[in-house]
C-alpha cells in the first residue's frame, strides 16, 4: 500500500488534507526557502527542495508531496512570509485595493522508482480598499505573521478580500483539485475513493 508523505510544517496544509480524509504522515522539511524574481521558479524550487528533503526520511512505498506558496504583485514582486508587524503592514498597504497573484508549486515524487510530477497553480486575488482602522485591527490579531502575503484567507484575512479568480484552496496553500487529479492519474492514489471508503466503513461500524 502506498503511503502519502506531506513534506510541510504548515498547519494550514496539514489541516486541509485531514479534512479531505487523507491518510498521510508529515515530515517537516529543514530547508532554507529561496526567493527569486520569478514566482514560478521560486515555488517550484522550494517545493522540489522540500520533497527531496523528506525523501531521505520517508518509508518505502512513499509518495512525497512538497509544496510552496508565494504572493506576487507588480509593485512588490515576489512576496514571502512577513516576520514582523512592520513588514506585514507595509505589504498589506501595497496590496490594498489591488489585484495580486497567488502561486503554489507542487512537486510529487515516488520513493520506490523516483518517478515525479510537478505543476504550478495560479489564483488571482483582489483585496478590498479596506480602511486604516481595519488594517490596524487585522495586524493586531498577529494572524499576518508568517503567512504568505501577510494574510490568511481561511481566517480573518477573508474579510480583506473582494474577489477571487481560480482555486480558493490554492490561496490556502494546496491546489486541491489539481493535486487530486495528478495523484490519481500518475501515482494511482485516489483521494476521493479513499475518503468515501473511510466514511462508509465509519458509518457501518456505528450501526
Swiss-Prot record:
Any one GO CC term of the record: cytoplasm
Essential cofactor(s): a divalent metal cation
Family: Belongs to the Maf family. YhdE subfamily.
Name used for this protein in its record: dTTP/UTP pyrophosphatase
Reactions catalysed according to its record: dTTP + H2O = dTMP + diphosphate + H(+); UTP + H2O = UMP + diphosphate + H(+)
Subcellular location: Cytoplasm
Residues marked Important for substrate specificity (site): 12, 69, 154
A single GO molecular function term of this UniProt record: dTTP diphosphatase activity
Listed EC numbers: 3.6.1.9
Function of the protein: Nucleoside triphosphate pyrophosphatase that hydrolyzes dTTP and UTP. May have a dual role in cell division arrest and in preventing the incorporation of modified nucleotides into cellular nucleic acids.
Keywords, ordered alphabetically: Cytoplasm, Hydrolase, Nucleotide metabolism
InterPro entries according to UniProt: ITPase-like_fam (IPR029001), Maf-like (IPR003697)
GO biological process: nucleotide metabolic process
Enzyme class at the top of the EC tree: hydrolase
Active site: 68
Top-rank taxon: Archaea
Amino acid at each position: 500500500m502506498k503511503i502519502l508523505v506531506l513534506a510541510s510544517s504548515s498547519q494550514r496544509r496539514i489541516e486541509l488534507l485531514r479534512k479531505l480524509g487523507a491518510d498521510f504522515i508529515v515530515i517537516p522539511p529543514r530547508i532554507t526557502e529561496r526567493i527569486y524574481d520569478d514566482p514560478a521558479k521560486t515555488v517550484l524550487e522550494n517545493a522540489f527542495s522540500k520533497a527531496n528533503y523528506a525523501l531521505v526520511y520517508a518509508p518505502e512505498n512513499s509518495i512525497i508531496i512538497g509544496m510552496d506558496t508565494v504572493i506576487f504583485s507588480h509593485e512588490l514582486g515576489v512576496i514571502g512570509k512577513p516576520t514582523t508587524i512592520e513588514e506585514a503592514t507595509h505589504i498589506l498597504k501595497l496590496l490594498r485595493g489591488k489585484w495580486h497573484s497567488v502561486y503554489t508549486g507542487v512537486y510529487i515524487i515516488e520513493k520506490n522508482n523516483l518517478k515525479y510530477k510537478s505543476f504550478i497553480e495560479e489564483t488571482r486575488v483582489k483585496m478590498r480598499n479596506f480602511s486604516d482602522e481595519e488594517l490596524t485591527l487585522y495586524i493586531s490579531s498577529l494572524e499576518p505573521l508568517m503567512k504568505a502575503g501577510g494574510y490568511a484567507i481561511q481566517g480573518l484575512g477573508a474579510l480583506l478580500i473582494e474577489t477571487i479568480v481560480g482555486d480558493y484552496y490554492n490561496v490556502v496553500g494546496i491546489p486541491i483539485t489539481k493535486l487530486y487529479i495528478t495523484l490519481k492519474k500518475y501515482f494511482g492514489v485516489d483521494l476521493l475513493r479513499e475518503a468515501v471508503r473511510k466514511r462508509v466503513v465509519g458509518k457501518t461500524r456505528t450501526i
